[in-house]
């Protein structure tokens, strides 16, 4: 795997917010009842949707088609859209109807992924992103995410 995403964080002076060895703290991911009914993994690239009466929710990652294969684009920025899968360092209380899952601190991060810390608040949940380091087939991205999924536990 390349070090391109690491260099982006290093050049921006944000290397302290880039992790590719171990999960830096307990992270939480909410799963909606709809996602659960569909049997979707907890960590998966949401394709986006348009909630009734609200602006569209963009896809988690950019997916392009190359020779008939769906390819996830590797993250190359510290901010913006299509960076990866959202997680938080605490549950978000106003997200009703979600079941929360915890990814424990010190869980090894698969070699094709990085976790980035996108905010640094003391008084509210901080956003973290599970990002693809490089372009890869969508199916392979899910394999790497599944390596983290197996460490998730349902939070009480």
Where are these regions (language model features)?
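NAD-dependent ADP-ribosyltransferases
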Residues: 1-156
